[in-house]
């Protein structure tokens, strides 16, 4: 045996001893938390294939609101129910704030993006983005969203018989509309960031781009063995191959667009020579604000690209899937769809000159619509959106956290170093959250004094700063399209569309074909 082999073996032994010593403390503290039995080395990883959120719901119903599972060698605690999540992530927010760092993710983003970064760097990123996504600034940007809804409505108009695309005017979409709907939310983010957008058609490049984003979001939510079984990392560090290829593909596109934007729109800041001059530069959008911080050496360029990828990927996939599930809910609950149509028709009646009457009216009728001032006119629609977010939670498990100090939650002591998961999916579908949780009922949100508290992307100090963009996009999307179109099952009005979401970082809507009729 050569000296190099001996050194490697000794290194592995020392590493394993350190790992066992560290894990012994965490396991010793966490062992009193109930949970399923785990297997040697792999823990419960083999149980977490496919519909992970449904398995965690099954365990919640068996073990309660605080339970323990093993991701390989990583002790993990799953928290469910609003009171439990609030106790952890709000009442003890500081020690639950950090993200659990997974090598597969940091290999791609270097831990420099908003979703995965920690500490002061994360706080600086969040402040930079939050300052650019205030309600006041979003009021000025509502027009961008309304223009995209108007363009999307042209696609639906073609399906319904008003044009030559989509379905040839038959009323039924020839292909699933998932990528087109996600293109709407992608275009909103591209317009907000770069002042560009893609057309709404089944172009092969656009289809591949949206399919890549969907694939990435489905895979990035899954637990990879290489992240949790250290001894396997050297052999599996580039697996699954598709995940890394999808990330690099989207990163290349966003980097190119960002570089082009700088050359075209930011010659002023690019030529600044002093810190004071850069400090005095007034950004006009989120991208310029991030690039300003880069010029001030407060964010590396990889951090700029990482944050843009968070906004674009998460913005298109979470919002897009929520819009898709909204359409599914309209089709599967035709009585609710009619209630919404009547409410919207009365709120935006023709006598006021506010008739939402087609893409050609973007300059007048649609541009008068405002999320900020018009929500009060549509309480049932607001309740419907909340119920969609409850019934089809867009981030079923959010992004895992890391506990940085020992803490007691609901009577159970949890060890420092534990991975912690927010079980949003099970929370929204639990009896503790609302009565009859498996029934789709917007009425539960009409009583504002006693309504359940929705968790959209997560709870606590890592709450997504872009949540208001998400809310505006969905509201305007639904007001305009419900007023213009009737949506139904493509084969038989008495049939139900499949609404079982597929697990991913965001809950994926099944492939959706739909019948569209003009109102």
From Swiss-Prot:
Keywords tagged on the record: Heme, Iron, Membrane, Metal-binding, Monooxygenase, Oxidoreductase, Transmembrane, Transmembrane helix
EC identifiers of the protein: 1.14.-.-
Cellular localisation: Membrane
Membrane topology: Single-pass membrane protein
Pfam entry (one): p450
InterPro entries registered for this protein in UniProt: Cyt_P450 (IPR001128), Cyt_P450_CS (IPR017972), Cyt_P450_E_grp-I (IPR002401), Cyt_P450_sf (IPR036396)
GO cellular component, one term: membrane
Gene3D superfamilies from the UniProt entry: Cytochrome P450
Similarity-based family: Belongs to the cytochrome P450 family.
Name used for this protein in its record: Probable cytochrome P450 513D1
Lineage: Eukaryota, Amoebozoa, Evosea, Eumycetozoa, Dictyostelia
UniProt gene name: cyp513D1
């Amino acid at each position: 045996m050569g000296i190099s082999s001996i050194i490697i073996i000794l290194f592995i032994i020392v590493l394993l001893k350190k790992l066992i010593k560290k894990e012994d403390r965490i396991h010793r503290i966490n062992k009193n938390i109930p949970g399923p039995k785990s297997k040697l080395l792999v823990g419960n990883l083999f149980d977490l294939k496919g519909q992970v959120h449904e398995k965690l719901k099954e365990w919640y119903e068996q073990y309660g609101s605080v339970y323990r599972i093993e991701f390989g060698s990583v002790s993990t605690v799953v928290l469910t129910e609003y009171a439990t999540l609030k106790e952890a992530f709000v009442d003890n927010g500081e020690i639950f704030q950090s993200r659990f760092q997974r090598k597969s993710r940091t290999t791609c983003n270097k831990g420099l993006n908003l979703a995965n970064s920690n500490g002061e760097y994360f706080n600086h990123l969040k402040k930079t983005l939050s300052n650019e996504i205030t309600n006041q600034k979003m009021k000025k940007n509502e027009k961008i969203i309304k223009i995209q809804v108007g363009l999307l409505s042209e696609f639906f108009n073609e399906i319904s018989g008003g044009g030559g695309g989509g379905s040839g005017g038959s009323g039924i979409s020839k292909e699933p509309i998932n990528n087109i709907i996600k293109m709407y939310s992608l275009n909103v983010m591209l317009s907000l960031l770069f002042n560009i957008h893609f057309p709404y058609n089944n172009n092969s490049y656009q289809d591949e781009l949206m399919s890549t984003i969907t694939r990435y979001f489905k895979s990035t939510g899954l637990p990879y063995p290489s992240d949790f079984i250290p001894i396997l990392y050297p052999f599996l560090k580039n697996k699954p191959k598709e995940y890394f290829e999808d990330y690099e593909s989207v990163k290349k596109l966003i980097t190119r667009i960002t570089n082009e934007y700088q050359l075209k729109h930011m010659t002023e800041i690019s030529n600044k020579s002093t810190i004071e001059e850069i400090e005095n530069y007034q950004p006009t959008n989120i991208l310029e604000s991030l690039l300003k911080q880069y010029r001030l050496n407060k964010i590396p360029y990889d951090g700029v690209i990482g944050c843009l990828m968070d906004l674009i990927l998460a913005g298109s996939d979470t919002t897009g899937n929520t819009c898709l599930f909204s359409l599914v809910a309209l089709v599967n609950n035709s009585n609710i769809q009619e209630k919404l149509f009547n409410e919207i028709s009365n709120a935006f009646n023709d006598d006021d000159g506010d008739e939402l009457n087609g893409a050609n009216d973007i300059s007048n009728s649609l541009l008068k619509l405002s999320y900020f001032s018009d929500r009060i006119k549509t309480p049932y629609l607001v309740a419907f959106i909340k119920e969609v977010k409850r019934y089809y939670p867009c981030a079923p498990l959010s992004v895992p956290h890391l506990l940085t100090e020992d803490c007691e939650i609901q009577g159970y002591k949890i060890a420092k170093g534990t991975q912690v998961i927010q079980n949003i999916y099970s929370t929204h579908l639990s009896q503790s959250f609302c009565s009859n949780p498996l029934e789709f009922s917007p009425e539960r949100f009409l009583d504002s004094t006693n309504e359940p508290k929705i968790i959209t992307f997560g709870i606590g100090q890592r709450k997504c700063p872009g949540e208001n963009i998400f809310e505006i996009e969905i509201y305007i999307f639904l007001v305009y399209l419900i007023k213009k179109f009737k949506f139904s099952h493509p084969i038989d009005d008495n049939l139900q569309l499949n609404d079982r979401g597929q697990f991913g970082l965001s809950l994926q809507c099944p492939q959706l074909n739909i019948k569209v009729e003009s109102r």
